[in-house]
Amino acid sequence: ASDVYKRQDKKSLRTLMLNVIRGDYRNSLAAINLALNSEDSETAHYAASVLQDVLNDFRSKVQTDYLLCQEENEQQVENCIKFVEYMNPILEQQVLTNLEQRSMAERMQEVLQKAWELDKIKISSTVYEKVCQRLLEVKDYEKCTLWCDRAMEQYPGVLSSYTCQMKLYFSCGKKEKFFQVMQELRDSDIAIDNETLEPVSYTHLTLPTT
C-alpha cells in the first residue's frame, strides 16, 4: 500500500511541478512544499532538481530581458512593465535565498523606475502593488515607501494604493500612520470589506525587531 501512495505522491508532485514549468504558478507553492517535505527521498530529489531547472530558466530570462529593457526604442516602457510582470510570480513564492530575493526585487524596481521616468501613465495599479509587495518582503522600506507614494499619487481612488501603505506602515511599526491611512480609506468612496479594516488582517506581516 505504501508503494501505491508513493506513486500517487510522485504523480501529483510531477503534475504540480509541470504547472510550475508551464508558468501556472497558482499551484507552485504546494509543489515546492511537497518537494522539500516528501518522505520519499527519490521524489524529493526529483522535485528539487525540477525546481532548480525552473529557477535557472528564470534567472537566464531575467538576465536577457533586463538587457532588453535597456534598449531605447518604442517598446521600452512595455518591455519594462512585462519584465516586472514576469518576475513577480517567482519572487512571490519566495523560493530564492534571501540575498538573491533582495537582489531580484531591487532589479524589479530598477526596471520599473525606467518605465516610470519614460511614461508612468502606462504603469497599472496592479504593477505598483506587485513591486510594493516584493520590496516589503525584503524589508526595503525606503524604496517601498517611494513606490507606495507613487501608487497613491497616480491611483488615489484604488484600494491597493491604501492597502500597500497600510501593510508598509504596519511592518515598520508606524501605528499612527497605519491608522491614519485606514481612516482615509474609511472616508473615501472606495468599496471595502471588513477584513481590510481589521488590524488583525496585517498580523502575518513581519514586524520590526526591537
Predicted regions and their residues:
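Structural detector for internal amphipathic alpha-helices that build alpha-solenoid repeat scaffolds
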Residues: 12-23, 34, 45-53, 133
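Amphipathic alpha-helical repeat scaffolds of TPR domains
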Residues: 74-94, 125-130
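Amphipathic alpha-helical scaffolding segments comprising HEAT/armadillo-like alpha-solenoid repeats
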Residues: 3, 25-35, 60-64, 145-146
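Short coil turns that delineate tetratricopeptide repeat
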Residues: 120-123, 156, 190
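Conserved small/polar residues in nucleotide/adenosyl-binding loops
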Residues: 1-8, 202-209
